[in-house]
From Swiss-Prot:
InterPro entries for this protein: GPI_mannosylTrfase (IPR005599)
TM segment ranges: 99-119, 124-144, 174-196, 210-230, 249-269, 303-323, 328-348, 350-370, 375-395
GO cellular component terms listed in the entry, alphabetical order: endoplasmic reticulum membrane
Entries under PANTHER family matching the protein: GLYCOSYLTRANSFERASE (PTHR22760), GPI MANNOSYLTRANSFERASE 3 (PTHR22760:SF4)
Protein name per Swiss-Prot or TrEMBL: GPI alpha-1,2-mannosyltransferase 3
Gene this protein is translated from: pigb
Length: 531
């Protein structure tokens, strides 16, 4: 009731100048709608049920409209692992043999797979789409939490602007329904922010926000980077510091870590501290640079501008007009970007979890626009529409489209099909998108953990001289796979090998308009004619 009373008082003060008649009319409307929706127990997740259903429905639509691949981890570090956990076959990359990844996140999808198996519905379509739909539902609920956070801190009008900016973000559209640890990190960070004790918050709960932060850390240890300044700020502001540490920080940290260790003990077969291994490899030793390195300013000059896109001017404007109590959020964003900048290996998705925080500042910008507001709305929608649709429906779709050709090999009776993927490692999904134990191989690319200067992985060795590698690898025709998959750019280099061994092109799918390096515009499947 205290929250409702404060809202009533705010509306009264705002409308005193409008006369008694208008005031009585607004008061009546407040008690019939606004007060009921402000109650924590109203509808779903403390919000209007229709809003929650609409938000989830939007993300489900978003999910169905994203039919492209982004990075290998969305399959190889989640669905592929879950498939191995449930069906006892599926490829585990070197990160799993070295204990750098934990089973907590794949366990969610393994549970889905197990239910489908028990129901006799473990068809490949369900195995591909239901995990993504589950992630879409969580992202939709996170959107509602972001809206609710701002509504409780400020007002409904500002909350609508923040939510509008969140829905317009092309990069959120691109990532929010993918089975990436970064996506789950963003979801949990948004939940945590809703319960974080910001000044003026009526939804704060130290226990709930710390649980969300702890879960994010278990799923992706670098999630703690965003929360380091926020945790210190909370500690500095807290009067009962000893109680906060003893009753909140330590119990939650110990329990969640114990749960993670237990899960990993079950699936690794030994005690494995994956969070420490992950941080040691990627942060302390900076060995992620094996997969590429960028200059220190990359996130500032490319990363942030690309993921914010046309939100950037509104974000900058929002930073100038947002009340001072939100400065800690800006500090958290800046700290995250600068910390990731210190690491050699950089990717757009690494800073995706700061995007919902940035939307708060964008919302303040729109709320404070005095002129050109309608033009700004149209500009933001249209400027994000093209990249959202292009990246979601066209760019890099071949990696998924080619899987339909592989799935058909499973349907052939008495199939003795075998497959070799002659592409940069992990370019396409694996057993999680095939769901049958046909023989499949690919060019591997584990990093050198022995620190040898002469080390070269299999994929790089292949691309030094593809034709020579193939002739050496398949020196006996009995070793030849029945099918080969490759990017179009490789075909001219190995055409003689294909011809001499009776390989014929059986499938061609479009992949990208922007081929570069070892990636081609199309993906080909070749089938060997043994007659």
């Amino acid at each position: 009731m205290e929250k409702v009373r404060s809202r009533v008082g705010w509306l009264y003060r705002r409308q005193d100048s409008q006369g008694a008649v208008q005031l009585r009319k607004r008061k009546s409307r407040l008690y019939s709608k606004e007060a009921s929706s402000a109650c924590p127990g109203a509808g779903l997740f403390g919000e209007n049920t229709y809003l929650v259903l609409a938000a989830v429905g939007f993300r489900i639509f978003n999910c169905m409209m994203v039919q492209t691949s982004f990075v290998p981890d969305e399959y190889w570090q989640s669905l592929e692992v879950a498939h191995n956990m449930t069906f006892n076959y599926g490829y585990l990359t070197w990160e799993w043999t070295e204990g750098l990844r934990g089973f907590s996140y794949p366990l969610m999808f393994a549970a889905i797979y197990k239910v489908l198996y028990l129901l006799g519905k473990d068809h490949v379509w369900f195995l591909i789409w239901i995990p993504r739909l589950a992630q879409a539902v969580l992202s939709g609920i996170a959107d509602v939490r972001l809206y609710s956070l701002v509504r409780h801190l400020e007002n409904t009008e500002l909350a609508k602007w923040v939510y509008f900016c969140q829905l317009c973000s092309w990069f959120t559209w691109y990532c929010a329904t993918r089975t990436l640890t970064n996506t789950m990190e963003a979801v949990l960070s948004t939940f945590a922010l809703y319960y974080y004790p910001l000044e003026g918050s009526s939804t704060n709960s130290s226990t709930k926000y710390l649980i969300c932060v702890a879960l994010a850390f278990l799923i992706r240890p670098t999630a703690v980077i965003l929360w380091i300044p926020l945790l210190f700020y909370h500690f500095a502001k807290e009067k009962k510091k000893a109680e906060l540490v003893v009753q909140q920080y330590l119990p939650i940290g110990i329990l969640t870590l114990a749960a993670s260790l237990t899960v990993d003990r079950i699936f690794f077969g030994k005690w494995t501290f994956v969070q420490w291994n992950f941080l040691k490899f990627n942060v302390l030793q900076d060995l992620g640079s094996f997969y590429g390195s960028h200059p220190w300013h990359w996130y500032i000059t490319q990363g942030v501008p690309v993921i914010l896109c046309t939100h950037l001017p509104f974000f900058i404007h929002g930073c100038m007009v947002t009340p001072k109590r939100y400065q800690i959020l800006l500090v958290a964003v800046a700290w995250t970007v600068l910390t990731y900048s210190a690491l050699s290996h950089k990717e757009f998705r690494f800073i995706y979890p700061v995007l919902p925080v940035c939307m708060v500042f964008c919302g303040f910008s729109f709320s404070n626009l005095k002129r050109w507001k309608k033009a700004a709305v149209g500009f933001l929608v249209l400027s994000n529409l093209f990249p959202a649709l292009y990246t979601g429906l066209i760019h890099q779709r071949g990696a998924l489209d080619i899987m339909s050709g592989i799935q058909k090999l499973c349907k052939m009776e008495n199939s003795s099909a075998s497959l070799f993927v002659l592409m940069p490692c992990h370019s396409i999904p694996f057993y999680s998108h095939v769901h049958c134990p046909i023989k499949m191989n690919f060019l591997e690319c584990p990093p050198d953990l022995s620190d040898s200067d002469a080390y070269i992985d299999e994929a790089d060795l292949f691309y030094v001289s593809p034709l020579a590698w193939l002739n050496a690898e398949f020196y006996n025709k009995t070793l030849l796979p029945t099918h080969l998959i490759m990017f179009s750019v490789l075909e001219p280099e190995i055409r003689s090998f294909l011809t001499n061994n009776n390989y014929l092109k059986s499938m061609s799918v479009f992949h990208t308009h922007l081929p570069e390096g070892r990636t081609g515009s199309h993906i080909y499947m070749y089938e060997r004619n043994s007659k």
